[in-house]
């Protein structure tokens, strides 16, 4: 109906407005920055970890915008909170058993952690910029101004993401990261084809990278839709309730953790590497340059650390978000059981084994997607960074967003039908 379409249109407009505000914010520079020196620094570090970090910030780091830190402090704070929740029974009880109040407490703690991390990272950036002559008037006043600007930009992005969660569709933080990744694609593609036209890049290699990207997208969509359906039967408690005697299933995805492990792993790898990039030029800190080089994309240490982090977060996040005990308890309370398996501990063990096997394949799939395209890009010497991690994040966020859009439209249509039915009943 027209009312439904207008309501959906309002939601989409709010969503688009939030992304436009974000993109405008990435072009607001920190006061006192020397743009010529910053531009020269990034020209010298194309294709390095600094370029990777710049991609995740949507180009805000290259412009030294107030949003240069993006939502990295928020992601790091969420990682720490997940670790504390998994290892501290009191926190787990408070967050999960207190319902809405527990959720608000968790959000408050994540915000507080984001603020503290943003201050810490902002001070590191500001001191490095001042000491390396990137500021027009380096000194205490510049450091203070830069810290306030960076922290304000990060906290504004967190608030903007929460507004998208409440008033829009999809996960606000994920959409901000998605917008950051795709914002640099048009210029990067243009630079690549310009390089091919001038003979700096082989056209065959460039087309090979594009073909591999299409294959990777198709593979991601196929795996993300794959499910292992565990059959569930329900005991017939009442002859009049036919549904209780029917069989159903529990859908378990191959990649139950979604895009979170890739984001978490990238954040952890980027954090020490970004510090190394800024402070490696200082006297007595030359060893940081070696660390930065060892953690560069394509290097053995980077591959090992990144793979271990992805595998760990796949198992860790799946265990936290989808505990087998909770699934078993829910089945038991609803009268469901797995054919040939006793309810309770045996069901929990079976589900845990199935989820563990799926997570093994899910982690292998994620490592392949995140690392294999990267090797191709490094070997082809493509002058921009768009590895498997960014591709995975972009595709999964789009799939999740489209699913939520469909759910929102169905919900709007259902509410409209209910209103019409109530109106007709009232007239009678």
What name fits each language-model region?
Residues 1-8:
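Positively charged, low-complexity/disordered segments
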Residues 9-428:
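N-terminal cationic and glycine-rich segments that engage phosphates or anionic surfaces
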